[in-house]
Design a protein with these regions (language model features):
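Short loop/turn segments that connect beta-strands within beta-propeller blades
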Residues: 63-65, 106-108, 155-158
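A short beta-strand motif characteristic of beta-propeller blades
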Residues: 67-73, 110-117, 160-165
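Short, solvent-exposed loop/turn segments at conserved positions within beta-propeller repeat blades
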Residues: 52-55, 95-97, 143-148
Length: 176
């Protein structure tokens, strides 16, 4: 998923599997000391959750050339990344049935906040922001009722969960 599209490109989408294959190889090669230079040359940034060689989990931000810009550590396996273009923050969501989402600076890799799903819910790994950046939406599972919901979060209030709506399905995965 594009994190910072070039103004002329209107966003760049890559086939996830092809991107992850290349991104994984670049990540295993290790973090370079030239991430600032990679950022300056980048027209777009991409995020991917990964398992590191030591078995720990992380999320890496890459340029379209495959250069690592930043990484953030995750407590468990992550899935997808959403980007807030207003605040220039990213959120990586836990892969189901995990309950965390990490808000971070995609340029520095600094963790800014850790979110936890409410009781009775887990994240399905995806989310997105409203066009004005005021709200974040996350795909979630209401496992007692066995159906999917979209959780609604107030970004300005520290990502406070303010509601939800039914996704009309059991396994809400990606939402656009």
């Amino acid at each position: 998923m594009s994190c910072r599209p070039h103004p002329a490109s209107r966003g760049i989408l890559l086939d996830r599997r092809r991107f992850l294959a290349g991104a994984g190889a670049a990540f295993v090669a290790g973090l370079g000391t030239h991430s600032a230079a990679a950022l300056e040359r980048a027209d777009a940034l991409f995020g991917a959750s990964c398992r590191r060689p030591d078995g720990s989990y992380g999320c890496a931000i890459f340029s379209e050339r495959g250069e690592i810009v930043s990484t953030v550590s995750l407590p468990d396996r992550g899935h997808d990344v959403a980007y807030d273009p207003v605040r220039r923050r990213a959120v990586v969501f836990a892969r189901r049935p995990r309950t965390f989402a990490i808000v971070f600076d995609p340029v520095s890799g600094e963790t800014l906040q850790t979110l936890t799903s409410i009781e009775g819910r887990h994240f399905f790994g995806h989310g997105f922001f409203s066009p004005d950046g005021a709200l974040m939406y996350a795909t979630e599972n209401d496992y007692d009722a066995a159906h999917g919901v979209i959780g609604v979060y107030d970004v300005a209030a520290g990502y406070r969960r303010i509601g939800e709506f039914d996704s009309h399905g059991m396994d809400t995965h990606e939402a656009l």
